[in-house]
Amino acid sequence: MAKKVIKIVKLQIPAGKANPAPPVGPALGQAGVNIMAFCKEFNARTADQAGLIIPVEITVFEDRSFTFITKTPPAAVLLKKAAGIESGSGEPNRNKVATIKRDKVREIAELKMPDLNAASIEAAMRMVEGTARSMGIVIED
């Protein structure tokens, strides 16, 4: 028989930099998980993606064991990296902060495809373009 799930914790942690300090410690401590075991495993699994923020979904079972699934970095983080900017525009409809090529949008959409509920790469590209637009990034062909 399968173990009973008692909690699902969703966090966004910088790759390879999970430590018991907040927000990781309190979120997992409440669920009764061995925080250091999670940190070591997460850091080992995400060491090759340094500099990116990785969303993670931790499933905690009745016996306090856990499993976790790492997802692809948020589109906004990938767009900022592609455009070489620190943050998006405060007023995206007035101030444009960067310009990126459509090829780069396709690359990001292909990377995000497993986590998006899009049927085609074109639909995924439209989602990424919408995120870019709301950040004040202009997309050119």
UniProtKB/Swiss-Prot annotation:
The keyword rRNA-binding applies. GO terms for molecular function: large ribosomal subunit rRNA binding; structural constituent of ribosome. SUPFAM superfamilies: Ribosomal L11/L12e N-terminal domain, Ribosomal protein L11, C-terminal domain. One or more lysine residues are methylated. It comes from the Bacteria. One of its GO terms (biological process) is translation. Keywords: Methylation, Ribonucleoprotein, Ribosomal protein, RNA-binding, rRNA-binding. PANTHER family: 60S RIBOSOMAL PROTEIN L12, LARGE RIBOSOMAL SUBUNIT PROTEIN UL11M. Part of the ribosomal stalk of the 50S ribosomal subunit. Interacts with L10 and the large rRNA to form the base of the stalk. L10 forms an elongated spine to which L12 dimers bind in a sequential fashion forming a multimeric L10(L12)X complex. Belongs to the universal ribosomal protein uL11 family. This is Large ribosomal subunit protein uL11. The gene is rplK.
